């Protein structure tokens, strides 16, 4: 397992991407899969940087582990922050069938994450938001 702790500010997104990508490339070169995971990382990290400590700032801890030998191989990404308690899984799914002008703002990002990953969980424990996403690697994507 690899982990990093970083200031939860938008400007650090590239560093988070580099960290996650380096860990993923130890097990896969599947560019589509890496793009999907990076999209989820972007949504989650930017939500932490925008809302977790508002007003104010704080840090985010990101853990990456790849498990499974030989298959199925699963990538676990855990995001932790000490910000305001917020369970994104409790939010109502946006109405993607509604006209754009009739939609409520927000919620599309976590909807996208939920529909991209194979598993997602949230807990608030000891003053921390802990969000974990799981993505299964296709059998033929192992490096």
Regions found by a protein language model. Name each.
Residues 1-3, 49-143:
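Conserved beta-strand-loop-beta-strand hairpin that lines the nucleotide-binding pocket
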Residues 18-42, 46, 102-104:
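Conserved short strand/loop->alpha-helix "switch" segment adjacent to the catalytic nucleotide/phosphoryl-transfer site
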Residues 10-13, 34, 38, 110:
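Short, structured helix-loop boundary elements
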Residues 8, 39, 124:
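Conserved strand-loop elements at the edges of beta-sheets that form or border functional pockets
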Residues 11-14, 26-31, 83-84:
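Short acidic/polar alpha-helix capping motifs at helix-coil junctions
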Residues 3-15:
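STAS-typified acidic loop motif
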């Amino acid at each position: 397992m690899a982990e990093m702790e970083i200031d939860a500010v938008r400007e650090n997104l590239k560093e988070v991407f580099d960290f996650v990508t380096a860990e993923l490339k130890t097990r896969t070169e599947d560019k589509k899969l890496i793009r999907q995971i990076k999209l989820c990382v972007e949504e989650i990290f930017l939500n932490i940087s925008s809302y977790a400590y508002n007003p104010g700032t704080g840090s985010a801890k990101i853990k990456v582990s790849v498990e499974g030998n030989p298959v199925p191989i699963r990538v676990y990404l855990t995001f932790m922050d000490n910000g305001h308690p917020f369970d994104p899984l409790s939010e109502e799914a946006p109405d993607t069938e509604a006209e754009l002008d009739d939609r409520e703002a927000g919620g599309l990002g976590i909807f996208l994450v939920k529909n991209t990953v194979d598993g997602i969980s949230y807990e608030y424990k000891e003053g921390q938001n802990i969000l974990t996403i799981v993505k299964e690697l296709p059998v033929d994507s192992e490096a």
